[in-house]
């Protein structure tokens, strides 16, 4: 996946996350940013990588997002590979 596609995907995920105040607050706490800061920095690839990581760490949130947007459950992990830090080698 190209980075631009992955960034668009992550922006959709962030918009979905912003609709859930509890989950958004958890993400804000984990990131060390306020919700306003997160939204201001939404175009930064590193932040978007963190958004996708957050979805990948929360199975219920991931399933809700995928179901609401008709996205195959494997897509977020593939998109993550195109964002900063996602191209790490697999040693197995």
Please report, for each region that a protein language model flagged, where it lies by residue.
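Metal- and O2-centered redox machinery and metal/ROS homeostasis
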Residues: 1-92
């Amino acid at each position: 996946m190209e980075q631009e596609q992955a960034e668009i995907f992550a922006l959709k995920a962030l918009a979905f996350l912003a609709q859930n105040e509890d989950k958004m607050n958890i993400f804000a706490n984990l990131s060390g940013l306020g919700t306003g800061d997160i939204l201001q920095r939404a175009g930064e690839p590193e932040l978007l990588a963190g958004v996708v990581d957050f979805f990948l760490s929360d199975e219920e949130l991931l399933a809700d997002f995928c179901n609401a947007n008709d996205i195959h459950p494997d897509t977020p992990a593939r998109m993550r590979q195109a964002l900063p830090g996602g191209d790490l080698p697999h040693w197995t």
